[in-house]
C-alpha cells in the first residue's frame, strides 16, 4: 500500500528544495532492501523517484547509483541518476522514472517473451567492460558477512527452506557451489517487479543495485521463480526455452538458494 502524498519532507536534502518545489511525494513502501522509495509528481513536470537509505557498512544505495550510471551509459533502459547526495545521515538518490508499469497486465505469452528478450539483451553486454564483480567468490563473502551481522531474515525463507537457519543454508551454499560460472552482465535481482513495460514494449530495468558480472543463472533463476509463481510451471519452462541456450536446473536451484540471503 502506498502512503498519502505529502510535500517534500524536512529531512530531505535542502539543496533539492528549489528544484523539487511543487512536487508531491508519495511513499512506495519498502522492498527487500532497507531503502525507502518515494514517487514524486507535479503538474506538467516529469515524474521522478527519490530513494534514501541510512548510511552503514551494509548500505546498498551507493552501489546502485554507480550501477545505474554505468548501465545507462551502456545503452540499457533504466532510471537516470539526476542527483545524489548525503544528508541527515542518509544517502539520497534522485532519479528519472522509467515509463510504463509492471508486467502484470501482459498476456502470459507476451510476458515470457519480453522477459527473455530483455535479459538476453542485458546478458549480451561484454562482461569484460563491466566494473562490478558479483561472481560467487565475492557474493559468498557478502553472504557470510550478512549472516554474521544478523541481516538475513529467516522468517522470509521460501517454503523449501523454512525452519532452517541462515548458518545452515550458508553451509549448503558452500557445499553446492558450482564448479564453473557462465559469466554475463547480470541484473542480480531479476524478479518480475524489476522489469517494466510500456504497452507491449519493454521499457527498462529498475532496482539495479546488484548488477554485475555473474552467472546468467542468477537472473534466470529469479525470473523463472516469479513466472512460475504467477503463471505456473509450464510458463516458467516456456520462458527458459524462449531465452535459449543450455540451462542447468541445478544451477537455477542454487541461485534461488543464494537469493534467500538478500
What is the role of each PLM region?
Residues 2-3, 68:
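Phosphate/pyrophosphate-binding loops and the adjoining catalytic core of nucleotide-dependent enzymes
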Residues 19-28:
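Conserved N-terminal boundary motif of the eukaryotic protein kinase catalytic domain
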Residues 58, 180-185, 198-253:
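Active-site Asp-x-Gly
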Residues 259-262:
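Short hydrophobic/aromatic patches at helix-to-coil boundaries
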